[in-house]
């Protein structure tokens, strides 16, 4: 993605030392200066961090989206690129986003978007994100909901553009129920337990 954007990538959230080593090795392999990848393990406010680092595109968590962080990014007026989960619109936080959000299912779609997006497009997307935030998630919306707590909030409309990927879903199910898939899950859980016991 850094190759395609020509900008910086700011990763907010924990990364293992092994992952950081892999990232640095990848940067060297492609001749990308290490200062174009910034790792911030923790911030109190994603919204403030996005503004402080002048981020113009937020690539949402994937394959499982993070709704709260998506709302913070939209509140900050930052354009959003959302991963379309192969069989759940809920897990991509698809319907929480604004109409016209950049959607991607495979890495090449994301790379193409990053390569083609110009400053004006990202600015317009950021403005659309901010409008969606004010319309659905702003403090006034919350205050109104709390003041009229007996009245149910209207459900937001489902956005157009989501279609499940049945082939990928079938592959996922096959991997999960096969012996190899079960062994892989057992191994990954054991590794996670071991890591958490050392923390």
Language-model segments: which ranges?
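Catalytic binding pocket for nucleotide-activated donors in carbohydrate/polymer assembly enzymes
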Residues: 53, 57, 61-137, 148, ...
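Nucleotide-activated donor-binding/catalytic signature segment of Leloir-type glycosyltransferases, i.e.
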Residues: 22-42
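C-terminal amphipathic helix plus adjacent low-complexity
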Residues: 111-199
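Short hydrophobic signal-anchor/transmembrane segments that target glycosyltransferases
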Residues: 1-7
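Conserved active-site histidine-acidic residue motif and adjacent donor-binding/catalytic loop
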Residues: 35-51, 65-66
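Acidic, amphipathic alpha-helical patches
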Residues: 23, 45-49, 70, 110
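Glycosyltransferase donor-sugar binding loop
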Residues: 8-22, 38
């Amino acid at each position: 993605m850094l190759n395609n954007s020509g900008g910086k990538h700011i990763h907010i959230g924990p990364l293992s030392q092994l992952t950081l080593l892999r990232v640095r090795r990848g940067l060297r392999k492609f001749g990308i200066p290490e200062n174009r990848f910034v790792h911030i393990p923790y911030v109190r406010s994603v919204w403030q961090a996005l503004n402080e680092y002048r981020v113009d595109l937020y690539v949402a968590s994937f394959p499982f989206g993070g709704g709260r962080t998506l709302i913070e990014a939209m509140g900050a007026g930052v354009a959003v690129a959302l991963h379309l989960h192969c069989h759940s619109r809920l897990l991509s936080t698809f319907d929480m986003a604004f109409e016209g959000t950049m959607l991607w299912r495979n890495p090449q779609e994301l790379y193409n978007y990053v390569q083609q997006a110009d400053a004006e497009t990202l600015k317009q997307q950021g403005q659309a994100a901010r409008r969606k935030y004010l319309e659905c998630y702003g403090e006034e919306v919350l205050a109104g909901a709390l003041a009229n707590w007996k009245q149910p909030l209207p459900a937001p409309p489902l956005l157009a553009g989501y279609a499940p990927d049945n082939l990928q879903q079938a592959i996922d199910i096959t991997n999960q129920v096969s012996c190899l898939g079960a062994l892989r899950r057992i191994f990954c859980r054991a590794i996670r337990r071991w890591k958490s016991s050392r923390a």
